[in-house]
């Protein structure tokens, strides 16, 4: 399989996941070698009491971007997040936000990736670093890899 086909299958798997079609329905995804971009349009359904997006949304986008940056180079199995640290810099309450994930380290069993979340003006609003490992779950049609 060519890399482009692998990236497109990962994108479809991600965008068709029930979590994204039901809750994060404006999600966009682009995957290439050791890099992934995950974005969405902010909606008030993601807001906490102070009228800005909840930290869980920051985490989701940062983790997903780093995760798919890693899975872009793992072509046989699904990877797993083993740990992830985030830093929230500023709030966001309108427009589009985009997380850009990149692989920083890779070995046979451990991967480290970082991601940065940007607001619509291109300002950094959060960043994170995660550790990832290969699972025993093969990439297949059963998990939406088509």
Where in this protein do the model-derived segments appear?
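Terminal targeting signals and extreme-terminal segments of soluble enzymes
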Residues: 1-146
């Amino acid at each position: 399989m060519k890399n482009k086909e692998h990236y497109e299958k990962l994108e479809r798997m991600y965008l068709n996941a029930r979590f994204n079609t039901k809750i994060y329905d404006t999600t966009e995804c682009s995957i290439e070698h050791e890099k992934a971009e995950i974005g969405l349009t902010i909606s008030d359904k993601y807001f906490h009491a102070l009228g800005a997006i909840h930290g869980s949304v920051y985490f989701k986008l940062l983790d997903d971007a780093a995760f798919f940056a890693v899975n872009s180079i793992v072509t046989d199995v699904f990877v797993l997040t083993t740990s992830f640290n985030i830093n929230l810099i500023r709030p966001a309450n309108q427009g589009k936000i985009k997380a850009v994930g990149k692989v920083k380290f890779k070995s046979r069993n451990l991967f480290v990736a970082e991601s940065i979340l940007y607001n619509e003006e291109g300002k950094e609003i959060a960043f994170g670093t995660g550790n990832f490992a290969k699972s025993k779950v093969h990439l297949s049609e059963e998990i939406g890899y088509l």
